[in-house]
């Protein structure tokens, strides 16, 4: 089989204006970025508001392996399958970050015959949104240091600045730095940090904003640090929100591309799900809902992370009601949860698959707790045996959960037709009983406990004194009624990435709490989660190259 990039480069891609016309969008309502990419204009978005909403389908997964279990591939493939059975469908995805593209994954635009294109552009710089977010974030950092250098009228305590610089690359050397060295003319020396761009609050704000006015309002609320009187200092107090919003004036507009089978795709925003809220933008999702009858979107990592935040944060703020949730499961991930070491995941082991089903069971239970009907999609890999696949299907049928095979990687939309039919049938027969894990009125501690106990299955949660002090401060500042955003390993229900399956009797430790006042949530950091990843021993970047003719290879 051809590689992902070879498949993408041989695709018959439509001019993006033709894709727009397919959606009923005039050429004058899109802003072209070459022949195959465009942004949807504010005029386009505004004129869609009176249209009825389509059906929102979420794609999530079991706790993944490091390689991922194919959520993006399944999302794209399902939309293509829906189109094949005559439904008007659209994909709504996050934008890939250069960090994992150059680190572990080598790309994040789907795979095989279920990709979004042009995949090289999407995986690399796309329409420049990531760079605009990086610039807006770092402008605020520059304004903070300049304010201190120019006399510090607001009395910012240099030791209590909480705003970090960002870059969209995995670079562990930047986790802890010292800035303004070299003499008095370079500013006030202090410790600082870099986060990856997709962990920036600016990214979260962009993805939760519904207009330019909303964006600017949220940016003004960003808390950058505290003054010597222990009062918060905001971006608004530094008069930074206008310039930041100006840098984001195009980045806030959703991007329109297409799948390999010319199904429309909106790709916009890209917060990580283990250290941020893990969903594409509200603007993109709401726009997609007006453009098609079936909208297929995804949330990062397993249902304990991305889906939980999709439901409790994004749907809460945006007023969204998902109709069904697809839980992507793979034989290899089930083997991992059944105790098989990473180097033996390709070996036949039906009993390990059966042991690992406890992980799938917990994710199914979690989706049901939100009142959303689940469907299990077994994402097929070439090395999977019939016996292993049959064991998963038999288990799902035994517990009464719909299950279908997904062969969209190898066959495109054709490989997901049965899954598409099942999804349409469930949507037509089920009325949504969507609900949240916690109420806005719950305290920040109570919200965290409800997630930890109900979604992760933990015995209890322990708050370090530092975290507890911060929580009490945030509640005193009036932020007690906003959601919590858990920062946790994606590999386990616990905060220990090596505790696979469905662990029991464990305690989650919240070591730090950080306020994201502009985004509107409090981040609870657990375990050893870092907001700046590092590159692996053999980064994917080593395999990426470009020919003298400008043809890229090595992306996947």
From Swiss-Prot:
<dbReference type="GO" id="GO:0035999">
    <property type="term" value="P:tetrahydrofolate interconversion"/>
</dbReference>
<dbReference type="GO" id="GO:0004329">
    <property type="term" value="F:formate-tetrahydrofolate ligase activity"/>
</dbReference>
<keyword id="KW-0067">ATP-binding</keyword>
<dbReference type="GO" id="GO:0005524">
    <property type="term" value="F:ATP binding"/>
</dbReference>
<keyword id="KW-0436">Ligase</keyword>
<dbReference type="InterPro" id="IPR020628">
    <property type="entry name" value="Formate_THF_ligase_CS"/>
</dbReference>
<dbReference type="Pfam" id="PF01268">
    <property type="entry name" value="FTHFS"/>
</dbReference>
<keyword id="KW-0554">One-carbon metabolism</keyword>
<keyword id="KW-0547">Nucleotide-binding</keyword>
<comment type="pathway">
    <text>One-carbon metabolism; tetrahydrofolate interconversion.</text>
</comment>
<protein>
    <recommendedName>
        <fullName>Formate--tetrahydrofolate ligase</fullName>
        <ecNumber>6.3.4.3</ecNumber>
    </recommendedName>
</protein>
<dbReference type="InterPro" id="IPR027417">
    <property type="entry name" value="P-loop_NTPase"/>
</dbReference>
<feature type="binding site">
    <location>
        <begin position="65"/>
        <end position="72"/>
    </location>
    <ligand>
        <name>ATP</name>
    </ligand>
</feature>
<dbReference type="InterPro" id="IPR000559">
    <property type="entry name" value="Formate_THF_ligase"/>
</dbReference>
<comment type="similarity">
    <text>Belongs to the formate--tetrahydrofolate ligase family.</text>
</comment>
